[in-house]
Amino acid sequence: MNQDRKWNIVGGRVIKTGIAVFLTVLVCDFFNIPTIFAVITAIVTIEPTATDSIKKGLIRFPASTIGSAYAMTFTFFLGHQAISYALAAMFTIVACQKLRLHAGTLVATLTAVAMIPITANHYFTAFLIRLATTSTGIIVSTLVNFFIFPPHYTKMIFGCTEDLFAKTANIMEEWITALVAGKGVKKETAQDLSKLTLLLHKAIQFVQYEQKDWKYHQHTKKEMRSFLTMQKQLHILQQIIYHIDNLARVSIETCDWSQSEREILQRTIHSIIAILRNRCNEIDEEHFKLIAELDKQFWSYKNDLKDYKPNHYHHHFSSESIILFEVLSIHDMLEELKQISEKYEWENRFN
């Protein structure tokens, strides 16, 4: 297990960075041009997606050109003085910001200050060489990112979706435990909920990455259906997590359930947990009966509040009605997930 974990540290981007640096040095040596600036550019041009590599490469090239131009200009007039470094850095940053070349600001500034001490004469020639090395780094790293281990995030999205179903069920289980005990949600549950939200954001980011490179790779109809299904599932899981977060914020201590109400709620939550762990592939008839009972309870609490005439400000929803509303909302999301799953299975069977 530990060996697997150590090996996972060396991911695709790390390997691609090494390959890009290696090939960049070979190209620079072949054309007999300096390697250091090309290598720096190659390292920073490796992005999570091929699309980002191309877009940011097109930004970093003009940014580096600006940095090189300022470096050579100030070195020509002021020499290798401290003021040359400062002015080259300042003017490069300002120019990149004004021209909205934000992604290239850091590389351009590093290029500018690094060029000054190694250039003693032939400033225009040095400027042209710098353009060549920057171009080499961008082109090589973009090609490496595109053709070698091209980014495919579908498996990662699937893994995150599996984890989200399981961990969402676990948090629901922690919440029902707190409800039975009549105590507030534990600190650990709140932390688990935060981690769950981070996992969701990670999965959504992977979806965005996959969409960016969608046009560069061929996909079968089944792969496209699978991706779109997971995308829909993540959207609904996001809503479920939102409702669970609301549940975690309700004051459980103020709830006053009857024995039958508490029992129905517990059975419903346990049913929801089982459905989530089964990825919403099946919802039995017993679950719908429990939801019908819960729905009656919800409207009963609402009607009781409607007839209540307080002498001072009061909340329009009691803790009990909020909990019932959130649980019923989660059930609605589960039904949507089941429909998505059924549609995916049907399309795979007949297409």
UniProtKB/Swiss-Prot annotation:
InterPro entries: ArAE_1. GO terms for cellular component: plasma membrane. It is found in: Cell membrane. It is a multi-pass membrane protein. Its main location: membrane. The chain crosses the membrane at residues 19-39, 74-94, 109-129, 131-151. Keywords: Cell membrane, Membrane, Transmembrane, Transmembrane helix. The keyword Chaperone does not apply. Belongs to the UPF0421 family. This is UPF0421 protein BC_2748.
